Amino acid sequence: MAGKFSFSNFFGMTEDEDYSTDLQGTKTTDEVSPTSRPDNIISMTAAGNAKMNKIVLCEPRIYSDAKKVGKHLLENKAVIVNFTRIEGAQASRIIDFLTGTVFAINGEIQRVGEQIFLCTPPNYEIDGNLSDIIDQNDFDSEVN
């Protein structure tokens, strides 16, 4: 091979020393010792022991049931809360409690239905907005 390669010569431009590369002597070998492992490899036993995240379904009937929902959140479990079996005033109090709980643990709370809420701890990510999807479906049915 030639001693020097130049992009400017290759493209027919004038010689510019900033872009020239010496191709001789650039031969390197990466040797890996038998005792070291690359950082991107994990043990299969470690992958098999991964803990599954859980989503808990709750239908509170009295205000004190909110404590159970809070405990699930503290255990890093997502909770779907259905308020169809409780009075509106009690549901409002529970939502206030859960909003505070979710704020304290740096989680999220999102309405996913008329009387259904999703509460997630910080290790979950809520992607999308269900009301946008519902509004789009309503729009599609009105157009057709």
Curated annotation (Swiss-Prot):
Transmembrane segments: none annotated. This is Cell division protein SepF. One of its GO terms (cellular component) is cytoplasm. The lineage of its organism: Bacteria, Bacillati, Bacillota, Bacilli, Lactobacillales. The gene is sepF. Homodimer. Interacts with FtsZ. Keywords: Cell cycle, Cell division, Cytoplasm, Septation. GO terms for biological process: division septum assembly; FtsZ-dependent cytokinesis. Cell division protein that is part of the divisome complex and is recruited early to the Z-ring. Probably stimulates Z-ring formation, perhaps through the cross-linking of FtsZ protofilaments. Its function overlaps with FtsA. It is found in: Cytoplasm. Residues 21-38 have a biased composition (Polar residues). Its main location: cytoplasm. Belongs to the SepF family. Gene3D superfamilies: SepF-like protein. PANTHER family: CELL DIVISION PROTEIN SEPF (PTHR35798:SF1). Residues 21-40 are annotated as: Disordered. It comes from Latilactobacillus sakei subsp. sakei (strain 23K) (Lactobacillus sakei subsp. sakei). Signal peptide: none annotated.
